[in-house]
Curated annotation (Swiss-Prot):
Coiled coil: none annotated. This is Probetacellulin. Residues 65-105 form the EGF-like domain. It comes from Bos taurus. Gene3D superfamilies: Laminin. One of its GO terms (biological process) is positive regulation of cell population proliferation. Residues 32-118 are extracellular. GO terms for cellular component: extracellular space; plasma membrane. GO terms for molecular function: epidermal growth factor receptor binding; growth factor activity. Glycans are attached at N34. Residues 140-178 are cytoplasmic. Keywords: Cell membrane, Disulfide bond, EGF-like domain, Glycoprotein, Growth factor, Membrane, Mitogen, Secreted, Signal, Transmembrane, Transmembrane helix. SUPFAM superfamilies: EGF/Laminin (SSF57196).
């Protein structure tokens, strides 16, 4: 029976929970906030090659997707700041830290998302430390068992070898031929 070299038969099974946890945490880290961001480029583009328009044009510059909320929506957002979506003619909210929802009505338990990258690194390090501790514990427990098994096997071999050799003194009788 051929035995695999030590360390070559490592099962990928313990890595699956770590991989799953990493993917879940990555999904949380990649998730965006709860509002649409305004465009960063306020300039107008014209022409086929998306070049900037000359400064002499009289076209008004776009201010963005949002404007101030009308007075009728003054208290529309419960825990946040109101802004008006120009294209849809509807109010929208920019929630205060720790709140979420269309009108900032829900408490966001995971509002410490600013440090998501740091949380991801800490979680991955913790998983790796737990994995290393698990591997060291398994090796520490298995090594004495292997030694004991080898010792028993060696003792059994010695016993079987000892039984096969018949004692010389018991079976041989001396005869005198002279």
């Amino acid at each position: 029976m051929a035995r695999a070299a030590p360390g070559s038969g490592a099962s990928p099974l313990p890595l699956l929970p770590a991989l799953a946890l990493g993917l879940v945490i990555l999904h949380c880290v990649v998730a965006d906030g709860n509002s649409t961001r305004s465009p960063e480029d306020d300039g107008l583009l014209c022409g086929d090659h998306a070049e900037n328009c000359p400064a002499t044009t009289t076209q008004p510059k776009r201010r963005g997707h949002f404007s101030r909320c009308p007075k009728q929506y003054k208290h529309y957002c419960i825990k946040g700041r109101c802004r008006f979506v120009v294209a849809e003619q509807t109010p929208s909210c920019v929630c205060d830290e720790g709140y979420a929802g269309a009108r900032c009505e829900r408490v966001d338990l995971f509002y410490l998302r600013g440090d998501r990258g740091q949380i991801l690194v800490i979680c991955l390090i913790a998983v790796m430390v737990i994995f290393i501790i698990l591997v060291v514990s398994i090796c520490t427990c298995c090594h004495p068992l292997r030694k004991r098994r080898k010792r028993r096997k060696k003792e059994e071999e010695m016993e079987t070898l000892g039984k096969d050799i018949t004692p010389i003194n018991d079976d041989i009788q001396e005869t005198s031929i002279a």
